[in-house]
Amino acid sequence: MTKIKLLILAVVMAVSSMPIFSAVVQGQELATTPLAKPKVIFFDVNETLLDLNNVSKSIATALDGREDLVPYWFTTMLHYSLVANVTGQYNSFVEIGIASLEMIAKQKNIALTSQQARTAVLTPFRDLAPHKDVVKGLKQLRALGYTLITLTNSSDAGIAAQLKNANLAQYFDGSLTVQNLATFKPDLKVYHWAQQQMNIAPQDAMLIAAHA
């Protein structure tokens, strides 16, 4: 499903007063409850709002043009973020990405300095363009009066730079990051914490996320 379809789905689900699905068990239709309009819509940022192609190109370049290693780097970064959740040894998402890149370069006998790895990860992550349908979708949601909040594994400084460089800051009412919580999504405590920060019940929230 494309990003804009997900955004439109959020609008349709939120404003509709009709059930969006029904279930049939042993020939009997089950009662459904209409979805309530959310008070807050949380947005994942990387991939959902921002195009990661520049990151992929930068990582491939750092790994001697090995585009086939980019998915390995990304899954390695995600793996160690989950390990950090379990062990309680938090490092920023970017730092994990840098360490993962250095590790893969060493595994594949690719010459890469620590500074080169840092530049390859940090520079493109801070300067990502939004997907072409994102601004239109955000404008539609703003026009409908929704409170829009980013919820990201990035640091406070990271999300501030990303939204500024992508010209998206104007569409959001605030940003929440895992920096102070020191726990990465998709740990359930992140979503509970975000709900508490906005002082809303779970049924009053909606999360928009699209991961390839």
Annotated model-derived regions:
Residues 2-11, 18-43:
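Non-catalytic pre-domain segments flanking phosphatase-related domains
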Residues 115-127, 134-163, 174-178:
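Substrate-recognition element of Asp-dependent hydrolases with the DxDx(T/V) motif
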Residues 30-78:
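Active-site neighborhood of HAD-like aspartate-dependent phosphohydrolases
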Residues 81-119:
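A metal-dependent, Asp-based hydrolase signature
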Residues 96, 129, 133, 154-155, ...:
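Short beta->alpha linker loops
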Residues 149, 156-206:
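Substrate-recognition "cap/lid" segment bordering the active-site pocket of phosphatases
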Residues 56, 70, 74, 94-102, ...:
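An amphipathic alpha-helix signature
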